[in-house]
Design a protein with these regions (language model features):
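Glycine-rich phosphate-binding loops of nucleotide-dependent enzymes
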Residues: 1-146
């Protein structure tokens, strides 16, 4: 953008870089966004934002509607962005995705945000208890098997 005007050449370069990096499948050479499938549009939007190397990124359901390979690419890109010093807030209902991406996990329940816990300190069961409204959740001791 120069003087408030989008420079077509620069936008085209960014688009092609994102299309290649995130394997966006386009039906024709220069498709409009509305011509992309939901999954391809998701890949393009996530890729475009990641290409900007933002200092802060908030994403909601980042891998919704994409295939497993694209989901892995998106997750790794979010991890790389975080490791590069950016703050990345991921909102997702996919616990596997959260455990793979997050350093810390918090849960919203009944309009309240729980404390953020190190991801390694949480289990799916503990997250379920937080979702049910528990504020302090202690891991139950494991029973010895006879």
């Amino acid at each position: 953008v120069k003087s408030g005007v989008v420079q077509r050449g620069g936008a085209s370069n960014i688009s092609e870089r994102v299309i290649t990096s995130f394997d966006v499948r386009k039906g024709k050479p220069d498709p409009e966004a509305r011509a992309l499938s939901g999954g391809n549009l998701q890949k393009f939007v996530i890729g475009r934002e990641l290409d900007r190397n933002p200092g802060i990124l908030v994403v909601n359901q980042p891998t919704w509607g994409v295939d497993a390979g694209a989901a892995a690419t998106i997750r790794q890109a979010l991890i790389d962005l975080s490791r590069g010093g950016s703050a990345v807030l991921v909102i997702s209902q996919d616990l596997d995705e959260i455990f793979e991406i997050a350093d810390r996990i918090a849960v919203i329940s009944r309009g309240q945000l729980s404390d953020a816990y190190p991801a390694g300190d949480l289990s799916a069961e503990r997250i379920g208890l937080l979702m049910a409204g528990a504020h302090e959740v202690k891991e139950a001791p494991h029973a010895a098997h006879a």
